[in-house]
Amino acid sequence: MISIFSKLKQGLSKTSGKISAGIDKIFYKKKLDAETLEELEELLISTDMGSLVAAKIIEDFKSLKFDKEVETTEIKETLANLIEQQLLESEIPFTLNENKLNVVLVCGVNGAGKTTTIGKLAAMYGMQGKKVAVAACDTFRAAAVNQLDSWVTRAKALLITGEEAADPASVAYRAVEESIKQDIDILFIDTAGRLHNKKNLMDELTKIVKVIKKVDENLPTHSVLVIDAITGQNTYNQVEHFNDATNLTGLIVTKLDGSAKAGVIVGVVQRFNLPIYFIGIGEQIEDLKIFNRHDFAKSLVGL
């Protein structure tokens, strides 16, 4: 059976291959100097880590003492440690309240893997003995409800739907009330995939939050944005706009196994101080992993 760390290394191979090969090329029979550090900074920026984060890491490199001739393994180990330090804010756990309904609002753009992620989470917590419900609030797209139904059936969870084209906020409100009646532990609210720059759709998300607060002002327990690692630089705009609409508590990053831009995780954590709750590194339910900054940093540089 493949270990979690091995699976993570495999999933991050596109980005780590780029970084590892880049370091090997930059430092082949060369020393750590202004020229090679500039090349390393450009390499980090190319993974969508962001110029500010890359510059900070390079500054930290400059403060360390190296021999004139430096081994690439030493560079990679140092880089992994410095990346891990940049991720200090990232490892806040996805905590749930005991003996009380937890409502998790899940949002994201079309194609980010939002519905699939909800299905995996429903299965994960169902296997832990939790009573799980899912509210289908993408009411204008029948295919979304069908996709969700397939996942929820596999997870043995309760699916709460509304009429086609019903007000998503009203479906969310009814789902919260129904979940309380049925002693549900976790209610995941699946929302319509939307572009972050479409104001009317973002307003709909804000309305859902306001409506469920009428049941309990402490809800939702979590507002989570699912982001696709392949998106790269546009991720920063997504996080900013969805955070404005829903006051995000954390992120889930999907499709890391298909991206050479996984450095974006480091940049997003630094810019928004939001934790990464889970990462997706494959299609199977077990491929949704709790984020571990140490393992991520090592895997990112190919160690």
UniProtKB/Swiss-Prot annotation:
Organism of provenance: Rickettsia bellii (strain RML369-C)
Role noted for this protein: Involved in targeting and insertion of nascent membrane proteins into the cytoplasmic membrane. Acts as a receptor for the complex formed by the signal recognition particle (SRP) and the ribosome-nascent chain (RNC). Interaction with SRP-RNC leads to the transfer of the RNC complex to the Sec translocase for insertion into the membrane, the hydrolysis of GTP by both Ffh and FtsY, and the dissociation of the SRP-FtsY complex into the individual components.
Reaction equations catalysed: GTP + H2O = GDP + phosphate + H(+)
Biological-process GO terms, alphabetical: SRP-dependent cotranslational protein targeting to membrane
Location within or outside the cell: Cell inner membrane; Cytoplasm
Name of the top EC class for this enzyme: hydrolase
EC number: 3.6.5.4
Listed GO MF terms: ATP hydrolysis activity; GTP binding; GTPase activity; signal recognition particle binding
InterPro entries registered for this protein in UniProt: AAA+_ATPase, P-loop_NTPase, Signal_recog_particl_SRP54_hlx, SR_rcpt_FtsY, SRP/SRP_N, SRP54_GTPase_dom, SRP54_N_sf
Keywords: Cell inner membrane, Cell membrane, Cytoplasm, GTP-binding, Hydrolase, Membrane, Nucleotide-binding, Receptor
Name listed for the protein in its UniProt record: Signal recognition particle receptor FtsY
Gene name of this polypeptide: ftsY
Membrane topology: Peripheral membrane protein
HAMAP family associated with the record: FtsY
Residues reported in the UniProt entry to bind GTP: 108-115, 190-194, 254-257
Assembly, per entry: Part of the signal recognition particle protein translocation system, which is composed of SRP and FtsY. SRP is a ribonucleoprotein composed of Ffh and a 4.5S RNA molecule.
Family of the protein in this entry: Belongs to the GTP-binding SRP family. FtsY subfamily.
Cited Gene3D superfamilies: P-loop containing nucleotide triphosphate hydrolases, Signal recognition particle SRP54, nucleotide-binding domain
PANTHER family, per the entry: SIGNAL RECOGNITION PARTICLE RECEPTOR SUBUNIT ALPHA (PTHR43134:SF1)
GO cellular component, one term: plasma membrane
